[in-house]
Amino acid sequence: MSVDMKLNRAQFDAVMVPNYAPAAVIPVRGEGSRVWDQEGNEFIDFAGGIAVNCLGHCHPALVNALKTQGEKLWHLSNVMTNEPALELATKLVNSTFAERVYFANSGAEANEAALKLARRYALEKHGVEKDEIIAFDKAFHGRTFFTVSVGGQAAYSDGFGPKPQSITHLPFNDVAALEAAVSDKTCAIMLEPLQGEGGIIDADPAFLKAVRELANKHNALVIFDEVQTGVGRTGELYAYMGTDIVPDILTTAKALGGGFPIAAMLTTTEIAEHLKVGTHGSTYGGNPLACAIGNAVLDVVNTPEVLNGVKHREQLLRDGLNKINEKYHVFSEVRGKGLLLGAVLNEQYQGRSRDFLVASVAEGLMSLMAGANVVRFAPSLVIPEADIAEGLARFERAVASIAAA
């Protein structure tokens, strides 16, 4: 390979599998909430790598953890345990409802583990007939065949042949539908406390109460997918902490590594004991390099200063978006929680969320979609107020360009 090979967007099409359609911009450097591309153009990051970069880019604490552990020990496999993994598991246990932790590398893997555990728990405790998983329309739980089938979006799961069975999808926040569906055959109810890919839709308190009560009544487990909402994103360490219920199993990834691949499944001792030696595993899960960074992330995020700061920054971002909307009238509402917000396009602009992303990039702002009708924002939890203000100014210019077209 030539050392002077030009690495550009065209090269992606030449060498990569075409399952992504990345922008023409290729970032090469990031610091805090700002990113620079190959041409030196600067962007403010309101996307956060899809709610991953919870401390922005190249946070000093994470860089230090990476360098320090990188000079000690990289990988072992689970033939042996390691100190960073034990430390991180202990922090997660001490900070949540959980008593046991399983490490993986991605949200999909953590969710796969959660679903397998729920099935095995039900099989061993109640028999083979108790295998139904109840999930919800517009949910997203990952891209493995099991998780994508449990996620309630046919666009992601169709086209791969026969799907895993005994999965029931219901409308999100529909208590009556839930009451009609849950039975003694239900082994688990899986949901996001705030649907991300589905459009930034918060779970109603009454709905969550029904989920917990029906699960208890029918000896089913409640699985919270907190891959996107976890590690401070909503202003709580985990979103369930801002609700009146506690799940039986929780999955976490994305922000847990602040940009380094790591995930975990959290549960109780009584449930965890059903994953005996050899029933599940991951070669990289609990990798000391990943866990060292995860420890650094929790040390920074799990503090009153950062978690309270998320709620303050939410208000700044929400107020700014509403102020833009007062002028241009493009959104029907701004919804979400903490620093996971969605600006819902009104009837005139339905289906055009990608247009807003493209216009934002042209103005030097990175944002996200949550479906065709929602512009999603998931910036760093510690984004400076000046960057929020400048990002909003750039977004307003993007909105103005679309409104004037």
UniProtKB/Swiss-Prot annotation:
GO CC terms, sorted: cytoplasm
Q: Which GO terms describe its molecular function?
A: identical protein binding; N2-acetyl-L-ornithine:2-oxoglutarate 5-aminotransferase activity; pyridoxal phosphate binding
Q: What keywords would UniProt list here?
A: Amino-acid biosynthesis, Aminotransferase, Arginine biosynthesis, Cytoplasm, Pyridoxal phosphate, Transferase
Free-text remark on how the cofactor is bound: Binds 1 pyridoxal phosphate per subunit.
Q: Which family does it belong to?
A: Belongs to the class-III pyridoxal-phosphate-dependent aminotransferase family. ArgD subfamily.
What's the name of the protein?
Acetylornithine aminotransferase
Q: How does it associate, per the subunit comment?
A: Homodimer.
Q: Which HAMAP family match?
A: ArgD_aminotrans_3 (MF_01107)
Q: Which residues are recorded with the post-translational modification N6-(pyridoxal phosphate)lysine?
A: K254
- Per the UniProt record, the source organism is Shewanella oneidensis (strain ATCC 700550 / JCM 31522 / CIP 106686 / LMG 19005 / NCIMB 14063 / MR-1)
On whether Metal-binding is a keyword of this UniProt record, the answer is no
Catalysed reactions, as listed in the record: N(2)-acetyl-L-ornithine + 2-oxoglutarate = N-acetyl-L-glutamate 5-semialdehyde + L-glutamate
Q: In which pathway does it act?
A: Amino-acid biosynthesis; L-arginine biosynthesis; N(2)-acetyl-L-ornithine from L-glutamate: step 4/4
Residues binding N(2)-acetyl-L-ornithine? R143, S282
Gene it is expressed from: argD
| Cofactors demanded by this protein | pyridoxal 5'-phosphate
Instruction: Give me the residues that bind pyridoxal 5'-phosphate, please.
Output: G107, A108, F140, D225, E226, V227, Q228, T283
- Asked if Cytoplasm is a keyword of the record, the answer is yes
